[in-house]
Amino acid sequence: MSLQFLTGRSGAGKTTWLLNEIRGKLREKPDRSPIIYLVPEQMTFMSEYKLASTPGLNGTIAAQVYSFTRLAWRVLQETGGSSRTHLSSVGMNMMITKILEEKKEELKLFHRSAGKTGFIGNMEQMLIELKRYCITPEEMKSITSEKLAVEADQSLKDKLHDLEIVYGSLEQALAGKYIDSEDYLTLLAQKIPQSAYLQDAEVYIDGFYSLTPQEL
């Protein structure tokens, strides 16, 4: 397995080069092993159109356009793990609200802010960032312990304390029953060795300005 980088400034033609590379391989051998074109969610439709509308290609079954989430769903359907109920942003907000109510006696700061406009949404974004940067509840607990030992700012101490409680409680509530959008990528990483679809696939990654540690 080799890794190649195509570099250049914005507008230099990197996407055109990649698409032409994929088209050439499809023309050469239409029944070839899978080609995966991995792009940001907002690029999937246009990328699919560009491939499907290529003159001379009789279908694009061998080449598929995916976002990270769509690829995760495809692999989980093959290997198992897609049976858990997907938790939308609304569902996540409801679960966070429930946790804040149930844990209000343990919380030092968040219980006073739970009713404020936008707080639950901000809380969700904080939890999403923790997952994207591969920080587990256990690591969060370790970080909190270190900060509590040296940090003088009581407000920050209280925030870290409460965030640790909410994050740990959320993961316990999700375990085995629900899956949120960020967890799809974690499961994808675990299932890659079991996927026959990915075994001989060629993967092209395009359109990302940056990648989170979870995506990497």
What are these regions (language model features)?
Residues M43, Y209-S210:
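Catalytic acidic motif of RecA-like/P-loop NTPases
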